[in-house]
Amino acid sequence: MWSLKSTLCIALLVTYSVAQDSTTVDTTAATTATGGTTATGGTTATGGTTVSGATTAASGATTASTCADDPNTDCTQYTSLCSNAKYTPLLQQFCPKTCGFCGGGSTAAPVQCVDSSTNCANWEKNGFCSSTFYDCANKKQYCAKTCKLCTTTC
């Protein structure tokens, strides 16, 4: 069985080697085959290896009632890739719980809303949060919690 780390390394190597041959390969929908299943039906790269256009369901596919991360994968190190469409098929297979791909909503740890400055309480008293002098992004950067901007897109 392939690990997520091995799969990502292979995907990057294929992308690199194909780029060196000046051939474009879309690896967005490619997943590593497991249990002897071969990914087929996509663009063929040098050497006749098909690397895109197919996804392979793992045996015992993840469902809402059995949603769990692969026990052999440290999914916490891949959380930054959860929203990257290029890695979605792999992360759905190996890290569905960590990345929030389980049915019934996200099971990923919620992002904590905090102030990065210790002066926010004083700044709020002085009108920082309601001031038009500072843009939303600055207010959110320093005092997201105090200014109640945690769920606001600036």
Curated annotation (Swiss-Prot):
Residues 67-102, 113-150 form the ShKT domain. SMART domains: ShKT (SM00254). Keywords: Disulfide bond, Repeat, Signal. This is Uncharacterized protein ZK673.1. Transmembrane segments: none annotated. Coiled coil: none annotated. Residues 1-19 form the signal peptide. Disulfide bonds join C67-C102, C75-C95, C82-C99, C113-C150, C120-C143, C129-C147. It comes from the Eukaryota. Pfam families: ShK. GO terms for biological process: innate immune response.
